[in-house]
Regions:
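A conserved regulatory-domain signal marking ACT and ACT-like small-molecule sensing domains
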Residues: 1-158
Length: 158
């Protein structure tokens, strides 16, 4: 919570006041502990209620001696992607050619891809990328249209 609200509010955020900030903004939190996780020693899973009534789930973990942060799940699909300042996520019907289209559109916009992962499940696919610079909404929209994405978004954690 501290990390999430540190980038969202102007006031100082601490481990003590982060739960209070969350409640005051309508964010429900719960601490759930499980004995043994086969994959991660610790993991944070966030379920978000969207304005359109849908929900999304994102999970992340910290690993290694350097405490590297990575995404490990989006909407039930497993992935292993470093968290970066600039990221893109697209959900689409699994079909050939999507990776090429995304690479072409980003290349034409001068955006360098740092990491990319495709995950599949139930006929759908998720493409998650880290990129070297912010991606404008026009480029995100162009990708979304060309790959016929169900959802697509740029995430900037500056």
């Amino acid at each position: 919570l501290k990390g999430m609200f540190s980038v969202l509010v102007d006031d100082p955020v601490s481990y003590v006041n982060a739960p209070v900030l969350a409640r005051s903004r309508g964010v429900e939190t719960a601490l759930v502990t499980e004995g043994d996780s086969p994959d991660h020693r610790s993991m944070v899973r966030v379920r978000m209620a969207c304005a359109d009534g849908s929900s999304q789930v994102v999970a992340g973990t910290v690993f290694g001696a350097r405490d590297s942060e990575k995404l490990v799940e989006i909407d039930g699909l497993d992935l292993d992607l470093p968290i970066s300042e600039h990221m893109l996520v697209f959900a689409y019907e699994d079909k050939p050619g999507v990776v090429g289209v995304v690479g072409q559109v980003l290349g034409a916009a001068g955006i360098n891809i740092a990491n990319m992962q495709v995950c599949r499940g139930g006929g759908g696919a998720l493409l998650a990328l880290t990129v070297d610079s912010a991606v404008d909404s026009g480029t995100v929209d162009a990708i979304r249209l060309q790959i016929n994405a169900v959802r697509g978004a740029a995430i900037d954690l500056e």
